[in-house]
Amino acid sequence: MTVKKRIGLMGGTFNPIHMGHLIIAEEARERFALEKVIFIPSYITPNKEVKAAPAEERMRMVELAVESNPYFSVSDMEIRQKGMSYTVSTLRALKERYGDDWELYFISGTDAVASLPLWYQPEQILTLCRFIGAVRPGGIQKAEEVVASFKKRGKNIELLPVPAIDISSTDIRNRIRNGKSVRYMVPEKVYTYIKEKRMYSE
C-alpha cells in the first residue's frame, strides 16, 4: 500500500500575516509530518467585514514571511481567481492538481473551527481534507463542541494544541493606527514592508 504524502494548506486574509500564523503552520507541519505547507491568501474572504489591504500587498507580505523556511511556500490561486474565495472550491482545485498521491491537511485557527458550521459546504470540506484546528490554552471548549457535532455525522476534525501567543491581525492593525510598534509581532521583513508602504496607518 502506497503511503500518501501530506501537504498542509493555510488559507486566510493575512491582513497582515503575523508570527501566530507561522507558529501554527510550523506546529502542524511537525505534528502531522507534512511535506510542506502552502499559504493561500484570499482575494476576498466570506464573512469578513473589515476591508483588507490590496491582495498584491498581502501576497507580498506572506512571501516575505515564509521565504526563509524551505517547507513553506505561497500560492496566488485565490488572488488570481479574484472574487469571493470559498475553501471548498480551493480544496477541489488542489485535489485535482495533486491527485490521489497527496493527502490535504487544511490548517485553521480556533475561531475558524468554532465558525465552521457557518462555512459554505462544511461537510464537503471535511470530506476533501483532514481539517486541523489550532487551539490555544483556554480556547478549547467551543472548538470541542463543534468537533463533537461533526463527529456524530462521521466527520473528523483534528485539534492541535499550540502555544498561547495572543497576536491577531486586528490587534496589529489597531496598534499601527494608534502609532504603536508591532515589531516582533510580525516577521522583520514584513515589519519593514508595512513601514515602507505606510500600511494600516489610516
Where are these regions (language model features)?
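Nucleotidyltransferase catalytic core that binds NTPs
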Residues: M1-E202
